[in-house]
Structure formats: C-alpha cells, structure tokens
C-alpha cells in the first residue's frame, strides 16, 4: 500500500515537471529581440501615420542593459526615414528603398519584448538635415553618416 502511494505521488510530480518543461520554453519563445520590438514599433508608426509613404528603420541606438523580464518597458531611441513605398501597398518597409530627400524622424519612448503584451509608447519628431553633429546621406538602402558622433 505504501509503495502504491509513493508511486502515485512520484507519477504526479513527474507529470507536473513535464508540464512545467513544456510551458517554460513556450513562454521564452514569445519574447522578441530588442530590434524586433523596435521594428514592431516602426510598423505601428506606419499603421497610425496619415502620410503618403511608409517609414523604415534608419538607425537604432544602443539597447538598454539586459533585463530578464520581457514585460518590463524598455527605453528606446531610433531614427526612421521615409521610403518610396506608398502606405496602401502594405509592403514590408524593409523591402522599400529610402526616398531621396525623404523625411527623417527621431523616435523615443518605450517598448516591451513580450509578444503578448503590446504596450508601445513612442513619440517621433521630424529631423532637419543634421543630427547630433552628423549629416547622413542615403542612397537606396544604404546610408553614410559623416561628422562627429
């Protein structure tokens, strides 16, 4: 009788451990990388924009220190540039060439790396020519920045 109880208890623990092992990897698989979270923010910017063309990530500032909790809002700073793709095409911005003399916007705010939670708090302001002592020249998909920085 004692052996049956021990066996039943062991079976329950084994089942719990198996379920835990199945749940933990799927939770971590839902976390985005810092860059993916920023690209999601750019997509949201394009969805909410009333401008004619899509914007694409031009420059991503350094990510913050590593934080194990994907649900914690992380500060973010990045630059986007107008592309040649019209917004209604719904083409991925990464496949669009930058528009010559297109608008450039500096964006700051917070993102989370959790795919389930989706709080984004991003504000973008248009930049005029020089940013932080640097001037960037962009041709199609490539940009060269000169100056300090």
From Swiss-Prot:
Task: List the Gene3D superfamilies hit by this protein, alphabetically.
Answer: 3.10.450.10
The UniProt entry, under Pfam families, shows:
Cathelicidins
Give the record's keywords alphabetically: Amidation, Antibiotic, Antimicrobial, Disulfide bond, Secreted, Signal
Using the UniProt annotation, give all residue ranges assigned to the region (Disordered).
61-80
Signal peptide residue numbers: 1-29
Q: Does the keyword Disulfide bond apply?
A: yes
Q: Does the keyword Kinase apply?
A: no
SUPFAM superfamilies from the UniProt entry = Cystatin/monellin
Broad class of the protein's primary localization: secreted
Q: What is this protein called?
A: Protegrin-1
């Amino acid at each position: 009788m004692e052996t049956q109880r021990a066996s039943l208890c062991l079976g329950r623990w084994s089942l719990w451990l198996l379920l835990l092992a199945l749940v933990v990897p799927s939770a971590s698989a839902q976390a985005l990388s810092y860059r993916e979270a920023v690209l999601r923010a750019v997509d949201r910017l394009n969805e909410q924009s009333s401008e004619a063309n899509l914007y694409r990530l031009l420059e991503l500032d350094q990510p913050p220190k590593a934080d194990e909790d994907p649900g914690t809002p992380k500060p973010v700073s990045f630059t986007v540039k107008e592309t040649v793709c019209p917004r209604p095409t719904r083409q991925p911005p990464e496949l669009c060439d930058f528009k010559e003399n297109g608008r450039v916007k500096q964006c700051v705010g917070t993102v989370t790396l959790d795919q389930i939670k989706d709080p984004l708090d991003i504000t973008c302001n248009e930049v005029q020519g020089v940013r932080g002592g640097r001037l960037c020249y962009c041709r199609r998909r490539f940009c060269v920045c000169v100056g300090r920085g």
